[in-house]
Amino acid sequence: MLTSNRQGMAVYLTSLKFARQLRRFGYVHYVSKKMRYVVLYCNEEAVQTTMEKLQSFHFVKDVQLSMRPYVQTEFQNAKPDKAKEYDYKMGL
């Protein structure tokens, strides 16, 4: 099975009764009842077209893309601080 890269998006709705309709656009990961938004995952290739389709619906307030694929996860300076390293050896 080939895995494709997915990207998340937060879709803010006017009412949650329309949340079930979003299942045809991707995988619905989470639905917030209090803040009325849906976290939706879809393929990276179809993100722009899906976003345009979602924004055209009358029940969608806003669509925001997740920036997680663009955030750097490898850090340059990964050495621990000398003072903290000494405290760990002491057992504090």
Curated annotation (Swiss-Prot):
Q: Which residues form a coiled coil?
A: none
* Alphabetized HAMAP family for the sequence: UPF0298 (MF_01126)
- Any one of the GO CC terms: cytoplasm
Location relative to the cell: Cytoplasm
Q: Which family does it belong to?
A: Belongs to the UPF0298 family.
Give the main localization category: cytoplasm
What keywords are annotated for this sequence in UniProt? Answer: Cytoplasm
Instruction: Enumerate the NCBIfam families for this protein.
Output: PRK02886.1
The yes or no answer to whether the keyword NADP is present is no
| Name this protein carries in UniProt | UPF0298 protein BH2594
Give the species this sequence originates from: Halalkalibacterium halodurans (strain ATCC BAA-125 / DSM 18197 / FERM 7344 / JCM 9153 / C-125) (Bacillus halodurans)
Q: Which Pfam families match?
A: DUF2129
